[in-house]
C-alpha cells in the first residue's frame, strides 16, 4: 500500500468534451446514483453568481471521512488507510494532492475536485466550544469525495460537459467515463410512500413550546438576538 510519505502532489491534465443529445441532469444522475459516493449538486437558476451550473461527480479516486481525530482514507485501487490527526488538516492535505495547472475560460468553474460536507461539530477545531450534542447517528463529522470525473451543465447556455482528470492516456479515461454514463439505470421498485404518521420528532409539543419560551427569555435578557430552534424528524424507509 502506498504510504502518505510516498504520495506527492500530482499535476493532472484535464480533458473536456461537450456532450450532445444527452438526458437532463437528473436522468444522468439516475444512471450513477447507485454507485458509492455519487454526488449531485443541482441548481435550476440561471443567475451566474448564484447557481448557473449543476455538477455530478462519480467514481471518486479518494474519499476522506473523519470522526473526531480518526481519519479514514479510501483510495481507488489502494484500499483503506487510517490516520489520527486534525480533520481540517487532513482535508487540506487531500486538497493538495492533485493540482490542475490549466485554465479554461468560458467553461464551468468546477471540473474536478472535492464534494462533501462538514458537520457543525467541526467548529471545535476552530474555537473552544462545548460538546453538548448527543452523538447517536454514527455519521462522519466530515466526508469529502474527490472526483476526477465530472458532468457539468451550464443552465444559461444549455450545454453539458464531461470532464476527466488524468496523468496519461486521455482516450482510455474518457471512454471509461462515457461507458459509465451510457449504462441504463437500475430498476427500482416503486412504493406507496411512508405516510405522515410515520414521522417522529425528537420534541414533544410541550417540549417545543418550553424551548420557545427559553429563547424569548434569552432574547429579553440580552444574551442572544436570535436562535435557530430546530427539531429532528425520523422516519423508517422501505427497502
Where are these regions (language model features)?
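Extended alpha-helical targeting/anchoring segments
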Residues: 1-239
Amino acid at each position: 500500500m502506498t504510504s502518505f510519505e510516498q504520495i506527492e502532489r500530482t499535476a493532472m491534465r484535464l480533458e473536456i468534451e461537450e456532450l450532445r443529445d444527452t438526458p437532463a441532469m437528473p436522468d444522468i444522475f439516475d444512471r450513477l446514483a447507485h454507485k458509492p459516493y455519487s454526488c449531485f449538486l443541482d441548481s435550476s437558476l440561471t443567475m451566474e453568481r448564484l447557481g448557473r451550473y449543476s455538477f455530478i461527480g462519480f467514481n471518486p479516486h479518494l474519499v476522506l471521512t473523519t470522526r473526531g481525530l480518526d481519519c479514514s482514507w479510501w483510495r481507488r485501487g489502494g484500499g483503506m488507510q487510517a490516520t489520527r490527526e486534525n480533520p481540517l488538516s487532513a482535508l487540506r492535505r487531500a486538497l493538495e494532492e492533485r493540482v490542475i495547472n490549466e485554465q479554461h475560460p468560458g467553461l464551468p468553474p468546477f471540473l474536478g475536485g472535492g464534494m462533501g460536507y462538514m458537520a457543525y461539530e467541526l467548529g471545535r477545531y476552530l474555537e473552544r466550544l462545548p460538546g453538548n450534542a448527543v452523538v447517536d447517528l454514527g455519521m462522519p463529522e466530515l466526508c469529502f469525495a474527490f472526483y476526477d470525473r465530472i458532468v457539468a451543465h451550464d443552465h444559461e447556455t444549455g450545454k453539458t460537459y464531461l470532464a476527466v482528470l488524468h496523468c496519461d492516456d486521455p482516450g482510455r479515461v474518457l471512454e471509461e467515463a462515457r461507458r459509465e454514463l451510457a449504462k441504463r439505470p437500475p430498476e427500482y421498485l416503486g412504493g406507496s410512500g411512508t405516510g405522515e404518521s410515520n414521522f417522529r420528532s425528537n420534541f414533544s409539543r410541550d417540549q417545543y413550546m418550553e424551548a420557545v419560551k427559553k429563547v424569548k427569555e434569552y432574547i429579553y435578557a440580552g444574551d442572544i438576538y436570535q436562535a435557530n430552534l430546530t427539531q429532528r424528524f425520523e422516519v423508517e424507509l422501505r427497502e
